[in-house]
């Protein structure tokens, strides 16, 4: 019925990488996730340890969702609501529900970052062509989508830590980008 369900309750315990795979499959096939599967993901997100974080397949699945040409915003939001996102990217967990108090930001840092990915995807798809014609043209000329999407996700990752969040964010990017599978040139660009 258009919703992704789990075959049995211990599904994630057998292979915690499946936590990422569930979201990637939902994105790939345009499916919603059954509420029981979301509850299981939230319960089992604790299974995401350093081994899962460093797992190349898990990182590839995450990058697939982040750079999806479909609806990355919705799927990233589901990942965030289930706590899988913050468990997989611990630096993101630090900005969940963090308020920003200035005239440019109307959302918490996590929601702002997820929404930024959504806007990028909408510009790329042409949905915002009338409102953002120049951005739509420029988007077609981007050399590396994944660099742009990763950079967009990480642009405020170090907010609230004291000091210049762009400098602190650079250190996070230097560690996270190779883990996600970006090469040295892509990492430097981010």
Predicted regions and their residues:
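Helical mechanochemical/support elements of P-loop NTPase systems and associated helical scaffolds
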Residues: 14-18, 58, 112, 165, ...
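Helix-hairpin-helix/helix-loop-helix acidic hairpins
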Residues: 124-135
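Long, hydrophobic, amphipathic alpha-helical segments used as structural scaffolds
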Residues: 30-33, 124, 184
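Divalent metal-dependent catalytic cores for phosphoryl transfer on phosphate-bearing substrates
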Residues: 99-102, 108-109, 135-190
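Non-catalytic interface/linker regions that flank or bridge core catalytic/transmembrane domains
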Residues: 1-105, 174
